[in-house]
């Protein structure tokens, strides 16, 4: 995952132009000039794969960060406010019952495709899971002796939340954020494949697979390259989440 991040950041130094077309080099096999060959429009598949990683990582990280921040705020307040809890958790339950892809398609259909709205469309349905997780942690921590002692000692609630409650939610939040990031990368690829995600002029793994699916027999690398990168990236993010869980909860590792 770190290697992929470095490669994407340094892409302008070694990769070609992912948008430049070579009409006389359509569907070419891998060569020293084009390592992964070219697609049906003569574009460099290697350059498009590397620059497509930027989109996937950016959408995944920003969607996970957005869902984590919003879910953290909702979960903390819901865990401490009974009246707020009853109302907001029912809304979260309603959002969780809607498939992520369908909700994202509905939002994008109303506003039009774009990276910003794509991040929002992915983050919204992922937020309820984060909020419920944080809420469960807060409910378990709020009754502990050190929290009650701080409140009895005259500490204000915001200070108690900041010093005692929020730190307890960070481990679970980081693990959940990794899960959301992996899910967001897959969702972005699926939406782009369907034509409602990243605009067609921007290289992404999803729209690369969609535009090359008819040429699988002629130029398999046009699909294999983005597909393999997508699978490896999602696997790496999931393994990162597993590693964080084992680090924060060694008992979970022993149980496995």
Across the structure, where does each feature detected by a protein language model lie?
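Amphipathic cytosolic juxtamembrane alpha-helices at the membrane-cytosol interface
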Residues: 43-58, 62, 82-89, 139-143, ...
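Glycine-rich helix-loop "coupling/hinge" segments at transmembrane-helix boundaries
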Residues: 96, 107-111, 122, 137-138, ...
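Helix-loop junctions at the membrane-solvent interface of multi-pass transporters
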Residues: 10-17, 77-81, 106, 110-111, ...
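Gly/Trp-centered helix-boundary motif
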Residues: 1-72, 76, 81-83, 101, ...
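Transmembrane alpha-helix boundary and packing residues in multipass membrane permease domains
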Residues: 4, 76, 104-109, 118, ...
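Amphipathic alpha-helical segments that mediate coupling or scaffolding at interfaces
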Residues: 49-52, 56, 77, 91, ...
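Alpha-helical transmembrane segments of multi-pass integral membrane proteins
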Residues: 59-63, 78, 89-93, 121, ...
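Generic hydrophobic transmembrane alpha-helix motif, especially the helices
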Residues: 35, 39, 69, 79-80, ...
């Amino acid at each position: 995952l770190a290697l992929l991040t470095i490669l994407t950041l340094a892409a302008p130094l070694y990769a070609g132009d992912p948008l430049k077309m070579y009409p006389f080099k359509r569907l070419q096999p891998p060569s020293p000039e084009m390592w992964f060959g070219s697609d049906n429009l003569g574009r460099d598949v290697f350059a498009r794969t590397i620059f497509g990683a930027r989109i996937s990582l950016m959408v995944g990280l920003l969607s996970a960060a957005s869902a984590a921040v919003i879910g953290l705020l909702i979960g903390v307040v819901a865990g401490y406010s009974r009246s707020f809890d009853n109302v907001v958790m029912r809304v979260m339950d309603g959002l969780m019952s809607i498939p992520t892809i369908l909700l994202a398609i509905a939002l994008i259909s109303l506003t039009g495709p774009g990276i910003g709205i794509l991040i929002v469309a992915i983050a919204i349905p992922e937020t309820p899971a984060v909020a419920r997780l944080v809420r469960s942690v807060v409910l378990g921590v709020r009754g502990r002796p050190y929290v009650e002692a701080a409140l009895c000692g005259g500490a204000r609630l915001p200070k108690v939340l900041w010093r005692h409650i929020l730190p307890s939610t960070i481990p679970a939040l980081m693990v959940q954020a990794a899960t959301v990031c992996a899910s967001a990368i897959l969702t972005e690829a699926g939406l782009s494949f369907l034509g409602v995600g990243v605009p067609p002029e921007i290289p992404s793994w999803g729209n690369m697979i969609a535009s090359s699916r008819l040429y699988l027999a002629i130029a398999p690398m046009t699909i294999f390259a983005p597909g393999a990168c997508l699978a490896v990236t999602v696997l790496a993010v999931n393994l990162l989440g597993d590693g964080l869980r084992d680090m924060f909860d060694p008992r979970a590792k022993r149980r496995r």
